[in-house]
Regions:
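Sequence/structural signature of beta-propeller domains
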Residues: 1-111
Length: 111
């Protein structure tokens, strides 16, 4: 586990950094009250699992998650996805900025 943020519903959003391992990184939601950990997102296995058809790298992570509820509405988060592979000199490496919605008040399925 790497980066976290806490929302106003006693839940922690947790991001994984796999550290250049073949395991595809995930994003988790930990509900403090229910003591329940649920996977809410994962990186694209077609791009980050070794041997996949569109493989880029196994060195991926998401980072910098912030609760954006005050700006985008309840259940919205902003984060970045870092794909540690070489690209053109202007960009340095792959990645993107993401908006993630975790619906509030909805029972999440445990995976």
């Amino acid at each position: 586990m790497d980066n976290i943020t806490i929302n106003n519903r006693s839940q922690i959003v947790i991001q994984e950094d796999t550290g250049n391992q073949s395991y595809v990184a995930k994003i988790w939601l930990y509900d403090i009250t229910a003591d329940q950990l649920t996977e809410v997102a994962h990186h694209d296995q077609d791009r980050f699992a070794p041997g996949a058809p569109n493989f880029l790298t196994q060195d991926e992570e998401s980072s910098g998650v912030i609760d954006a509820s005050a700006i985008l509405g309840e259940g919205w988060y902003l984060l970045d996805q870092q794909a540690h592979y070489a690209t053109d000199a202007e960009l340095v490496e792959g990645g993107q900025l993401l908006a993630l919605h975790i619906p509030p008040g909805k029972k999440l399925q445990v995976r």
